[in-house]
């Protein structure tokens, strides 16, 4: 018989830097999960990733105090800022453009994000990422 699910916990944790302090500790402690076990498993799973890159994770908590977790791809805004070499997006994206991205850069980001996007193909994924880039005040070359 399948385990009874008591809840889902969604967090964004820097790769390789999960520790019992907030927000991880309180979120897992409320459900009675082993915090250190999660931290060790998450840090081991993100060891190959760039340290400090925020990774969204969905933790499934079961009634027997066990858990599983699924890691998602980093947020598109983080990947776009990294590709453009920016600290933050534009405060007024319509008038104040802060950077420029090429189609090749957008394709690379779209390939990274593809498992989490609902796009039918790579071109649709690129257009989705281009929309995010425009809303951050980035100029996009080669995408309609």
Swiss-Prot record:
Protein name per its UniProtKB record: Large ribosomal subunit protein uL11
Entries under SUPFAM superfamilies matching the protein: Ribosomal L11/L12e N-terminal domain, Ribosomal protein L11, C-terminal domain
Entry-linked InterPro entries: Ribosomal_uL11, Ribosomal_uL11_bac-typ, Ribosomal_uL11_C, Ribosomal_uL11_C_sf, Ribosomal_uL11_CS, Ribosomal_uL11_N, Ribosomal_uL11_N_sf
Molecular function terms, GO-annotated: large ribosomal subunit rRNA binding; structural constituent of ribosome
High-level lineage: Bacteria, Pseudomonadati, Pseudomonadota, Betaproteobacteria, Neisseriales
Post-translational modifications reported in the UniProt record: One or more lysine residues are methylated.
GO BP of this protein: translation
GO cellular component, one term: cytosolic large ribosomal subunit
Gene: rplK
Organism of origin: Neisseria meningitidis serogroup C (strain 053442)
Task of the protein: Forms part of the ribosomal stalk which helps the ribosome interact with GTP-bound translation factors.
Family of this protein: Belongs to the universal ribosomal protein uL11 family.
Subunit structure of this chain's protein: Part of the ribosomal stalk of the 50S ribosomal subunit. Interacts with L10 and the large rRNA to form the base of the stalk. L10 forms an elongated spine to which L12 dimers bind in a sequential fashion forming a multimeric L10(L12)X complex.
Alphabetized SMART domains for the sequence: RL11
Pfam annotation, one family: Ribosomal_L11_N
């Amino acid at each position: 018989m399948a385990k009874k699910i008591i809840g889902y916990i969604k967090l964004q944790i820097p790769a390789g830097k999960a520790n019992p302090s907030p927000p991880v500790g309180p979120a897992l402690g409320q459900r009675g999960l082993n915090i250190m076990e999660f931290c060790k498993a998450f840090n081991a799973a993100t060891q190959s990733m760039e340290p400090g890159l925020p990774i969204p994770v969905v933790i499934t908590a079961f009634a027997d105090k066990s858990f599983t977790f699924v890691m998602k791809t980093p947020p598109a805004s983080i990947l776009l800022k990294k590709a453009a070499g920016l600290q933050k997006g534009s405060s007024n994206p319509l008038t104040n453009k802060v950077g420029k991205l090429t189609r090749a850069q957008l394709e690379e980001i779209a390939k990274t994000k593809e498992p989490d996007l609902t796009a039918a193909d790579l071109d649709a994924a690129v257009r989705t990422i281009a929309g995010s880039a425009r809303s951050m005040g980035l100029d996009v070359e080669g995408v309609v």
